[in-house]
């Protein structure tokens, strides 16, 4: 099973140093606003993904007047113990797995399958397709070992093609990249479409559990990044070559993929209330967690920042029951302990954080 046994951090945001030994179920971090609760969630997410969900400027993560931050986790995965670490300075990142240098962040992410729910998560429905692609590709990455390699090949070919388009290089040179782009895009399309097909029944199940008042089932409509009416992606590139050259970039492809969520043919964003939108995102994450567990025989780890801001008391309890049922280790933050029901005390741990200092509650 995937669990974080211990997590240590140094010089991350306002936290000088902290060490937490987590329980198997609920792990609750309680504190006032700006005490450092979100920084702990952010630190675990950064170890798992290599990036923050709060800033695109990594140097902001390093504590003021310090030159380096360090994150370290001891994990269980399929009954094996792994130790992973990340050290970051203003211009360098060092990754280690079991004492050896890791080649890529993807190697770290594969060891630490973490999902994230924050007060901003409902934007998955509101904003452009980038967040929905990231959601989909998290699942594809963990579900299909070929996906990350195909995505890298695609990104490399796309970068080279776009560079050639901007430089107005001869058509023969630009089109050299088309074959690589098409080959990777078509394989990525198959993986993504298959993943969404597998995900949808679980989404239906968790929508019913969290929103029984909605009697119609959700639908997931995957869009590959080019019109379905096109004869083929290869032909579409050829037909739009002049326009791509004029604009200096590739209009169509896997980098434009999206998912549309609908109920009875209507956009989810249009018919769901703000509260229901948050529940829908919870259902998406639970569906993804279940599919991951079915595939890997290991549960994910769920990070939830400020759960009371996300859900009312009734739905908080429902969500926590589902997380326990799925055997998902969940790490939550809240401004008050009594806002979070402790359903399985023997698997739970609670901390209070003040000014970046953690105190475990007995």
Swiss-Prot record:
Protein name as catalogued: DNA replication and repair protein RecF
HAMAP family: RecF
Location(s), subcellular: Cytoplasm
Family listed: Belongs to the RecF family.
Entry annotated with the keyword DNA-binding: yes
Disulfide topology: none
Physiological role: The RecF protein is involved in DNA metabolism; it is required for DNA replication and normal SOS inducibility. RecF binds preferentially to single-stranded, linear DNA. It also seems to bind ATP.
GO MF annotation list: ATP binding; single-stranded DNA binding
GO cellular component, one term: cytoplasm
Transmembrane annotation, as ranges: none
Main location per the UniProt record: cytoplasm
Nucleotide-binding in keyword set: yes
Example of a GO biological process term: DNA synthesis involved in DNA repair
UniProt keywords, alphabetically: ATP-binding, Cytoplasm, DNA damage, DNA repair, DNA replication, DNA-binding, Nucleotide-binding, SOS response
Chain residues that bind ATP: 31-38
């Amino acid at each position: 099973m995937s669990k974080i046994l211990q997590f240590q951090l140094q010089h991350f945001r306002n936290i000088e140093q902290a060490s937490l030994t987590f329980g198997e179920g609920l792990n609750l971090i309680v504190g006032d606003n700006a005490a450092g609760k979100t920084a702990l969630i952010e630190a675990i997410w950064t170890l798992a993904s290599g990036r923050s969900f709060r800033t695109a400027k990594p140097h902001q993560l390093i504590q003021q007047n310090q030159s380096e931050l360090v994150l370290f986790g001891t994990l269980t995965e399929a009954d094996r113990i792994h130790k992973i670490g990340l050290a970051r300075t203003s211009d360098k990142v060092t990754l280690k797995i079991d004492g050896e240098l890791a080649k890529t962040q993807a190697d770290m992410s594969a060891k630490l399958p973490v999902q994230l729910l924050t007060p901003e998560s409902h934007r998955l429905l509101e904003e452009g397709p980038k967040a929905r692609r990231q959601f989909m590709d998290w699942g594809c990455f963990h579900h299909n070992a070929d996906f990350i390699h195909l995505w890298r090949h695609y990104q490399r070919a796309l970068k080279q093609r776009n560079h050639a388009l901007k430089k107005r290089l001869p058509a023969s040179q630009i089109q050299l990249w088309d074959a690589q782009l098409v080959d990777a895009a078509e394989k990525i399309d198959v993986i993504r479409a298959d993943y969404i097909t597998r995900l949808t029944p679980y989404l239906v199940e968790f929508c019913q559990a969290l929103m029984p008042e909605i009697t119609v089932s959700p639908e997931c409509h995957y869009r590959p990044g080019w019109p379905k009416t096109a004869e083929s992606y290869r032909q579409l590139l050829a037909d739009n070559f002049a326009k791509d050259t004029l604009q200096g970039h590739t209009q169509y492809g896997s980098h434009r993929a999206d998912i549309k969520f609908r109920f009875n043919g209507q956009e989810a964003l249009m018919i769901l209330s703000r509260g229901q939108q948050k529940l829908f995102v919870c259902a998406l994450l639970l569906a993804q967690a279940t599919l991951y567990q079915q595939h890997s025989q290991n549960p994910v780890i769920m990070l939830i920042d400020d759960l009371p801001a996300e859900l009312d008391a009734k739905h908080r309890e429902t969500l926590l029951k589902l997380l326990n049922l799925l055997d998902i280790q969940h790490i939550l933050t809240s401004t008050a302990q009594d806002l979070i029901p402790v359903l399985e005390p023997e698997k739970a741990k609670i901390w209070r954080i003040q000014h970046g200092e953690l105190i475990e509650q007995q």
